[in-house]
Amino acid sequence: MQLNSTEISALIKQRIEKFNVASEARNEGTIVSVSDGIIRIHGLADVMQGEMIELPGGRFALALNLERDSVGAVVMGPYANLQEGMKVTGTGRILEVPVGPALLGRVVNTLGEPIDGKGPIETETFSPVEVIAPGVIERKSVDQPVQTGYKAVDSMIPIGRGQRELIIGDRQTGKTAMAIDAIINQKQSGIYSVYVAIGQKASTIANVVRKLEEHGALDNTIVVVASASEAAALQYLAPYSGCAMGEYFRDRGEDALIVYDDLSKQAVAYRQISLLLKRPPGREAFPGDVFYLHSRLLERASRVSENYVEKFTNGEVKGKTGSLTALPIIETQAGDVSAFVPTNVISITDGQIFLQTELFNAGIRPAVDPGISVSRVGGSAQTKIIKKLSGGIRTALAQYRELAAFAQFSSDLDEATKKQLDHGQKVTELMKQKQYAPMSVFEQAVVIFSAERGYLVDVELAKLADFEAALLSYAKGQSAELVSQIDETGAWNSEIEAQFVKLVEDFKATQTW
């Protein structure tokens, strides 16, 4: 069969018209150097700050330095198999993590992947780790309490829903213990909890998870882990991931509590990344934006208005406010609260609980220093009964500390000073509390009432703990109705006062401690 030139050209034309190449536009680059978890990439012209870059083997890096000819990115995970010349791809996506009720009771890593061996997490909701905090108009004032279960905290340094209260102190002063007890105390309160462990030993984290499980609080809690053995990038991002998980509840009209344990280690991880990216160092070798690192995180903890929740849920949730309460932890070196990161976080938060090594070693636990611990907004959120009864606690402790210092130099003290010293000693003893034993509103109220109304004058200091335990046991047996009323409402009036007086006087008459 012979084809003439016209037919040949017609066939070629037909082929050309039908020719189809499957093509896709990809933002691609080449790795030019790999060192200490930092990769430098040539290409990737359209990459965004904070964009996920896909690496060979299904891993990801985070674009942080955008330069004229190259991109500096930090690898999220192991980087031993990465080599120069490998091709990488921009995803066009900012880092997102899974959020929602399916994460409650689970232990996840920074990327929201389960690491507790309980199988995959079934959730279809994802949220970016970096979100702009709610604006001024979208917020509501803090006026509902978060009960930590600690007498010393709930009476002197009350915390409200939507507040940021810093827990600060040297190592081994009970910072984590206080935060864990606050989480355990929320199991009946309807507040969801998120515990973010940054740069801690895996054994310590395992112990925390076990304790939460033992006390029935894990089902209500999400644990986000970036342990000491993980990449600096994951330690730096862990608080933002945890915050996104907590915001899920806030934005839907629920209440959540988040603990960052601790932000000192996050700042160190960020310093490491910044120095490796050749960013100019500042004070204590931290980069210039270390304040912004913490402020943009802690500003996301807030109480949001009904309108915000309604708008966010497209009208599905009406008339409910949401809140995210933050308890950031900062570790100081030799009690130096004037270091760079501690002063930054103190200025960002709404108050601080300062735990002192001297008090801890003296057996006063929780080792709260009432002199420099403060809650700037919690007073308006305090339960009415605790607010009414605990007014003199801080004053009594402050006067006792001052008098105790003078009493060391003087032996002949007048009767009034002796009384004041005795009262201060007893209040100090009364503020002590065992770990994993949070107290209800009623329990705190009746103990503080006994101290404030002078019912402890004839009780020996050594027998005070027995007196407290016996009083609480007696109250639960004799006045169950009053106990449940106070725990539910937190109200205080002359009728309740009369019931309290009768309860304590009847108990003292039994002499059963």
Curated annotation (Swiss-Prot):
It is found in: Cell inner membrane. It is a peripheral membrane protein. It is an enzyme of class 7 (translocase). One of its GO terms (molecular function) is ADP binding. ATP binds at G169, D170, R171, Q172, T173, G174, K175, T176. It catalyses: ATP + H2O + 4 H(+)(in) = ADP + phosphate + 5 H(+)(out). GO terms for cellular component: plasma membrane; proton-transporting ATP synthase complex. The record marks S373 as: Required for activity. It comes from the Bacteria. It holds the Pfam family ATP-synt_ab. The keyword Phosphoprotein does not apply. Keywords: ATP synthesis, ATP-binding, Cell inner membrane, Cell membrane, CF(1), Hydrogen ion transport, Ion transport, Membrane, Nucleotide-binding, Translocase, Transport. Its EC number is 7.1.2.2. InterPro entries: ATP_synth_asu-like_sf (IPR023366), ATP_synth_asu_C (IPR000793), ATP_synth_asu_C_sf (IPR038376), ATP_synth_F1_a_nt-bd_dom (IPR033732), ATP_synth_F1_asu (IPR005294), ATPase_a/bsu_AS (IPR020003), ATPase_F1/V1/A1_a/bsu_N (IPR004100), ATPase_F1/V1/A1_a/bsu_N_sf (IPR036121). The keyword Metal-binding does not apply. F-type ATPases have 2 components, CF(1) - the catalytic core - and CF(0) - the membrane proton channel. CF(1) has five subunits: alpha(3), beta(3), gamma(1), delta(1), epsilon(1). CF(0) has three main subunits: a(1), b(2) and c(9-12). The alpha and beta chains form an alternating ring which encloses part of the gamma chain. CF(1) is attached to CF(0) by a central stalk formed by the gamma and epsilon chains, while a peripheral stalk is formed by the delta and b chains. Produces ATP from ADP in the presence of a proton gradient across the membrane. The alpha chain is a regulatory subunit. NCBIfam families: atpA (TIGR00962), PRK13343.1 (NF009884). Belongs to the ATPase alpha/beta chains family. This is ATP synthase subunit alpha 1. It comes from Photobacterium profundum (strain SS9). The lineage of its organism: Bacteria, Pseudomonadati, Pseudomonadota, Gammaproteobacteria, Vibrionales.
